[in-house]
């Protein structure tokens, strides 16, 4: 399922992922992916996983397991992407020297998403499929952000199918909390400390705001004004319907 070839394409260092040409956004002379991550051009020798071989098998799997990906909007997104045609996936790097060496070729480093995804089962004592942990917890349910849905709902099931292992029971994809319209992330420096919110507004108010403001699967924009106003409304009108 894996072979050696050469790769060239646009790569997001922040998301650790290559980006298709039709998903590139140009702004001020630079290229970005749909999530706002700047892209750089990469050319290197690479090992590839034959992802294209699993396209039809994945589509059959989605069809026979209609609740595998929720919410439905994310399922439709994944199916549309797979139907558009899967290319073989680069699964090694030579442009840096940190990470796990490819066992048969030490100048190559295993692609981070290949070794990261296997943690779901290696933490359960795999390859010992008879371990209590593996038998109890696999297959499991993954709760992931919408920005990494393809890794979990396309690449990961294909890896598992190739290894003749069960895919996850379900992929649950949540949206983002944004801060003034931007994704909240350490790299952007706009992270909100939940402990500070609790200290300022109280635990129940914070919980209420988070659950009330964003239907599951959608994005929600954080605002201290909104959480304060919501708290005041239900303190002053305790019988008001939620």
Q: Which residues does each PLM region occupy?
A:
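Alpha-helix boundary/capping detector
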Residues: 19-23, 88, 223-224, 232
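Single conserved hydrophobic/aromatic residue that forms the stacking wall/gate
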Residues: 233-242
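Alpha-helical recognition segments enriched in aromatics with Gly/Pro capping
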Residues: 47-224
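N-terminal, positively charged nucleic-acid-binding surface of large information/translation enzymes
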Residues: 1-61, 66-67
């Amino acid at each position: 399922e894996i072979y050696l070839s050469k790769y060239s394409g646009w790569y997001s260092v922040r998301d650790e992922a290559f980006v298709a040409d039709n998903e590139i956004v140009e702004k001020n002379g630079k290229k970005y992916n749909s999530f706002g991550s700047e892209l750089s051009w990469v050319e290197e020798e690479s090992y590839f996983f034959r992802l294209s071989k699993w396209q039809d098998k994945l589509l059959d799997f989605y069809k026979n397991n209609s609740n595998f990906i929720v919410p439905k909007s994310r399922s439709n997104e994944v199916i549309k992407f797979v139907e558009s045609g899967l290319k073989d996936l680069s699964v090694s790097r030579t442009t840096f020297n940190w990470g796990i060496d490819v066992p048969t070729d030490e100048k190559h480093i295993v692609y981070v998403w290949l070794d990261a995804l296997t943690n779901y089962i290696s933490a359960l004592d795999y390859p010992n499929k008879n371990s209590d942990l593996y038998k109890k917890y696999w297959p499991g349910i993954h709760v992931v952000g919408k920005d990494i849905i393809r890794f979990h709902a396309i690449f990961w099931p294909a890896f598992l199918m190739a290894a003749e292992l069960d895919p996850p029971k379900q992929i649950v994809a949540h949206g983002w909390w944004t801060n003034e319209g931007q994704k909240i992330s350490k790299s952007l420096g706009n992270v909100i400390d939940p402990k500070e919110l609790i200290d300022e507004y109280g635990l129940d108010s914070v919980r209420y705001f988070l659950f009330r403001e964003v239907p599951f699967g959608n994005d929600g924009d954080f605002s201290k004004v909104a959480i304060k106003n919501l708290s005041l409304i239900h303190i002053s009108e305790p019988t008001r319907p939620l």
